[in-house]
UniProtKB/Swiss-Prot annotation:
Catalytic activity, reaction form: (6R)-5,10-methylene-5,6,7,8-tetrahydrofolate + glycine + H2O = (6S)-5,6,7,8-tetrahydrofolate + L-serine
Signal peptide: none
Annotated EC: 2.1.2.1
Protein name, as recorded: Serine hydroxymethyltransferase, mitochondrial
Listed GO CC annotations: mitochondrion
Similarity remark: Belongs to the SHMT family.
Pfam families to which the protein is assigned, alphabetical: SHMT
Note: In eukaryotes there are two forms of the enzymes: a cytosolic one and a mitochondrial one.
Pathway where it operates: One-carbon metabolism; tetrahydrofolate interconversion
Single GO BP term: tetrahydrofolate interconversion
Length: 485
């Protein structure tokens, strides 16, 4: 028996060593195939102009935490109330993240709380809705083709429910004025009194103008609704005080953390605390209960263990957002967007609402002989990443008349106004090329998808497209990505 035990020791030692070697190697050694994909994506990001307004380049410090030991820990529950042991440092990280979030937006911890465990923006909205509504309650949000978001309850005019939120709740959209491109607050006020929603969402994903939060508050009060402001796209601008803040007028504020805020891919739900109202006759105080209902909705209502590496990385991003450099960055984001828009207008493009107050622009291509899907495709071929987008009046999200572009990502890489003017020139050239290529699409292509595939093949075969791609790649590659300086 002793001999058998002695013989097993070196065998177990070799097995243990083999396991340690497996988990201690870097990805290029363990999985060359995946490493090649990663390398290709790194190269694509460096040598492409990123115009998608919901994208950004996060900092190396944030990346340090995303790939850290913080991801190893399970921690269902909240700081001081976990269902697992060993969370003393996870508690510190989450509490620090919450404190920094409130501080960044100038919020009194006695009057506001924040949940930082939601995994991303759409789930965060669902969690917030579920905290204050029952299944079948009524919700109003900006219609998707008018600049809203799927998570605001999108359904087709026919009644087909696209977002599951429109299945859980009874949703009705509000719209922009199609002449001005500005939200039609008067019609919203009238409709909300008839529809009587439980929640009105003040938030957008493709709307380039400021939101009138005071007007939203008045409308919500007029129909007895909660006002939920979704500032996912503009949270960085709000933090830097370069655009109006929703907090003064809102009951709940949700946001993603990876867009203009330039953090990891996560979300936050801010909610009011303290006294909601006081009965004038009896003096009885009615408190807000969001701290209980929203936190319960996140856990255990919808999620299990939070992503501690993301929460820790978010804490770092929130600290960086308090710096003067971040404020200057956000000012440049807006300045770049305005210069970008002005140059596009000079070149004959039409912009929904005529311009921008924030970080994005929505191009109306309906009178240019090309659609958003084809323009997105040819831009990708020349190393410019943008996205097709619906505009008011569009019937199809796959072949819409709009193109959405934004400035946060390339401003992070050092673009100034003159650089975005150059990008406008590239887009103009791409439109001219795409119109010519569209006329050459295969006659055998009968449906819209086949025609788009034919168009992409023509792009691949086009020498002018290839030449433009090389020019863009060479130019943008001179701008650093985070970590190169």
């Amino acid at each position: 028996m002793m001999l058998l035990r002695a013989a097993r020791v070196p065998v177990l030692g070799r097995r243990f060593l083999s396991q340690q070697q497996l988990i201690s190697k870097h990805v290029q050694e363990v999985d060359p195939e995946m490493f090649r994909i990663l390398s290709d994506e790194r190269s694509r990001q460096k040598h492409s102009v990123t115009l998608i307004p919901s994208e950004n380049f996060t900092s190396k410090a944030v990346m340090d935490l995303l790939g850290s030991e913080m991801q190893n820990k399970y921690s269902e529950g909240y700081p001081g109330e976990r269902y697992y042991g060993g969370n003393q440092f996870i508690d510190k990280a989450e509490s620090l993240c919450q404190a920094r979030a409130l501080d960044l937006y100038g919020l009194d911890p006695e009057k506001w709380g924040v949940n930082v465990q939601a995994l991303s923006g759409a789930p965060a909205n669902l969690y917030a809705y579920s905290a204050v509504m029952e299944v079948g309650d009524r919700l109003m949000g900006l219609d998707l083709p008018h600049g809203g978001h799927l998570s605001h309850g999108y359904q087709l005019p026919s009644g087909t429910k696209i977002s599951y939120i429109s299945k859980y709740f009874n949703t009705m959209p509000y719209h922009v004025n199609t002449e001005t491109g500005i939200i039609d607050y008067d019609t919203l006020a009238m409709t909300s009194k008839l529809f009587r929603p439980k929640v009105i969402v003040a938030g957008t994903s493709a709307y380039s103008r400021k939101l009138d939060y005071a007007r939203f508050r008045k409308i919500a009060d007029g129909c007895g609704a909660y006002l939920l402001s979704d500032m996912a796209h503009i949270s960085g601008l709000v933090a830097a005080n370069v655009i109006d803040s929703p907090f003064e007028h809102s009951d709940i504020v949700t946001t993603t953390t990876h867009k203009s805020l330039r953090g990891p891919r996560g979300a936050m739900i801010f909610y009011r605390k303290g006294i909601k109202k006081v009965n004038k006759k009896t003096g009885k105080e009615t408190p807000f209960t969001f701290d209980k209902t929203i936190n319960f909705s996140v856990f255990p209502g919808h999620q299990g263990g939070p992503h501690n590496h993301t929460i820790s990385a978010l804490a770092v991003a929130l600290k960086q957002a308090k710096t003067p450099e971040f404020v200057e960055y956000q000012k440049q984001v807006v300045s770049n967007a305005k210069a970008f828009g002005d140059e596009l207008l000079k070149r004959g493009f039409e912009l929904v609402s005529g311009g921008t107050d924030n970080h994005l622009l929505l191009l109306n291509l309906s009178n240019m002989g090309i659609d958003g899907a084809r323009l997105e495709a040819i831009l990708e071929k020349i190393n410019i990443a943008a996205n097709k987008n619906t505009i008011p009046g569009d019937k199809s999200a796959l072949f819409p008349s709009g193109l959405r572009v934004g400035t946060p990502a390339m401003t992070t890489r050092g673009f100034q106004e003159q650089d975005f003017k150059k990008v406008a020139e590239y887009i103009d050239n791409a439109v001219k090329l795409s119109i010519a290529l569209k006329s050459q699409e295969s006659a055998d292509a009968k449906d819209v998808r086949s025609k788009l595939n034919s168009f992409k093949q023509l792009c691949d075969q086009s020498e002018p497209v290839q030449k433009l791609a090389e020019e863009v790649s060479s130019w943008v590659g001179t701008f650093p990505v985070p970590g190169e300086l």
